[in-house]
């Protein structure tokens, strides 16, 4: 038995290592989960979410750099906004915030940050869809946004909940009605949206040939788009993955294999996973789900996560030749942070871990096709 364990450990650590000598990045000044960010040149911008109305920057090319706070975001505190960078400027869209009545509401406003003079400007536009649970990435002179919750349905749920006051029975009735629906009845966004800053125009880039998502990992590299998992209704994720390609006829999509299950576990899909590219390899890690929810849904339970506990994850997956495999594990569970590809590494910034605790850590992972390195 001891020989078997030793052999297994040797094989495991031959595939991934923890590097003590590589460049390390300073922790965030505050834990940021449910926030957003973008990379402009060598500078990364991260903020909002549990960071309140603050944004912070870090010069990645300077080994001695520390996080710096920039001008306060003028749109107020909000969770799950979308951000991307175009032409050296940072764009922030939507999110979830409380109104004057204390109701959580989806907002569809837009802001631009100019690093050259450290100023924000509210843009004269509104997103055509709710952008909570949406994922964004830039390509050329546009920001592309995938998925998201339905503004009217989501806002209505929170309005009804606040209106119920302290009436627990009424609140339970509202929650039961909200969660006891089919995925398609939540009307998650099923179009790929784009926003072009130079014209201040939104565009419908076509329907996605798969179910609407919230909290999907969404990455654009060159002309390829990758979508990994996400919620298909509140509390229920999918293990599906998809790949798109920009063509003269628009984005052409194809299905990829489902994300595999870790050994001895079920694969209930992930929301809030982090992703990026290292040495040409696509990596995705972390995320959260409700183990057993897909099984309950297949048994006919629409409230698929009822009675289940939320779990955070640490597996690192890579996509190679159209197939997924697990190449290692992070030292901690993580989800709902910000990830960015930089210098052949994927930086995992902030996020949350078990129980929803906000993280200040900045980790870097890299993969060369044989070995996963975690810094």
Curated annotation (Swiss-Prot):
Task of the protein = Converts alpha-N-acetylneuranimic acid (Neu5Ac) to the beta-anomer, accelerating the equilibrium between the alpha- and beta-anomers. Probably facilitates sialidase-negative bacteria to compete successfully for limited amounts of extracellular Neu5Ac, which is likely taken up in the beta-anomer. In addition, the rapid removal of sialic acid from solution might be advantageous to the bacterium to damp down host responses.
Q: Which PANTHER family match?
A: LD33804P
Q: What class of enzyme is it?
A: isomerase
Catalysed reactions listed for this entry: N-acetyl-alpha-neuraminate = N-acetyl-beta-neuraminate
| Record keyword Repeat present | yes
| A Pfam match | NANM
Name used for this protein in its record: N-acetylneuraminate epimerase
**Gene responsible for this protein:** nanM
* GO MF terms, alphabetically ordered: racemase and epimerase activity, acting on carbohydrates and derivatives
Query: Main site of residence?
Result: periplasm
Kindly indicate where the leader peptide sits in this chain.
1-22
Repeat (Kelch) positions are: 43-87, 89-140, 142-176, 177-222, 225-273, 295-344, 346-375
Could you say which EC number(s) this protein's record lists? 5.1.3.24
Q: Does the keyword Signal apply?
A: yes
By sequence similarity, the record places it as follows: Belongs to the NanM family.
Organism whose genome encodes this protein: Haemophilus influenzae (strain ATCC 51907 / DSM 11121 / KW20 / Rd)
For this UniProt record, the keywords arranged alphabetically read as follows: Carbohydrate metabolism, Isomerase, Kelch repeat, Periplasm, Repeat, Signal
A single GO cellular-component term from the record reads: periplasmic space
Q: State the compartments where it is located.
A: Periplasm
Subunit structure, interactors included: Homodimer.
- Record's InterPro entries? Kelch-typ_b-propeller, NANM, NanM_proteobact
């Amino acid at each position: 038995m001891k020989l078997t364990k030793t052999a297994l450990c040797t094989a495991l650590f031959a595939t991934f290592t923890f590097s003590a000598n590589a460049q390390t990045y300073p922790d965030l000044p505050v834990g940021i989960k449910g926030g957003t960010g973008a990379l402009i040149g060598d500078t990364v911008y991260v903020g909002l979410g549990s960071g309140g109305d603050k944004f912070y920057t870090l010069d990645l090319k300077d080994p001695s750099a520390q996080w710096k706070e920039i001008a306060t975001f003028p749109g107020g505190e909000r969770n799950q906004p979308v951000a991307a960078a175009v032409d050296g400027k940072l764009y922030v869209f939507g999110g979830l915030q409380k109104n004057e009545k204390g109701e959580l509401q989806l907002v569809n406003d837009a802001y631009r940050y100019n690093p050259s003079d450290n100023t924000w400007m509210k843009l004269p536009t509104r997103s055509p869809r709710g952008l909570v649970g949406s994922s964004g990435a830039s390509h050329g002179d546009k920001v592309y946004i995938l998925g998201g919750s339905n503004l009217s349905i989501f806002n209505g749920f929170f309005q009804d909940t606040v209106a119920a006051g302290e009436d627990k029975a009424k609140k339970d009735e509202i929650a039961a009605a909200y969660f006891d629906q089919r995925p398609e009845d939540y009307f998650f966004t099923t179009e790929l949206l784009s926003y072009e800053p130079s014209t201040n125009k939104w565009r419908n880039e076509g329907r996605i040939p798969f179910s609407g998502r919230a909290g999907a990992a969404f990455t654009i590299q060159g002309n390829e788009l990758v979508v990994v998992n996400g919620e298909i209704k509140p509390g229920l994720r999918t293990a599906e993955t998809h790949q798109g390609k920009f063509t003269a006829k628009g984005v052409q999509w194809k299905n990829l294999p489902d994300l595999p299950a870790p050994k001895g576990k079920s694969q209930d899909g992930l929301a809030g996973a982090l992703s990026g590219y290292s040495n040409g390899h696509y990596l995705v890690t972390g995320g959260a789900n409700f183990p057993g929810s897909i099984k309950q849904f297949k048994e006919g339970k629409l409230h698929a996560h009822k009675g289940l506990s939320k779990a955070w994850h640490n597996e690192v997956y890579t996509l190679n030749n159209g197939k997924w495999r697990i190449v290692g594990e992070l030292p901690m569970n993580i989800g709902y942070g910000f990830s960015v590809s930089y210098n052949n590494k994927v930086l995992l910034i902030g996020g949350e871990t078990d129980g929803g605790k906000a993280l200040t850590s900045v980790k870097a992972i890299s993969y060369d096709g044989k070995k996963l390195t975690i810094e």
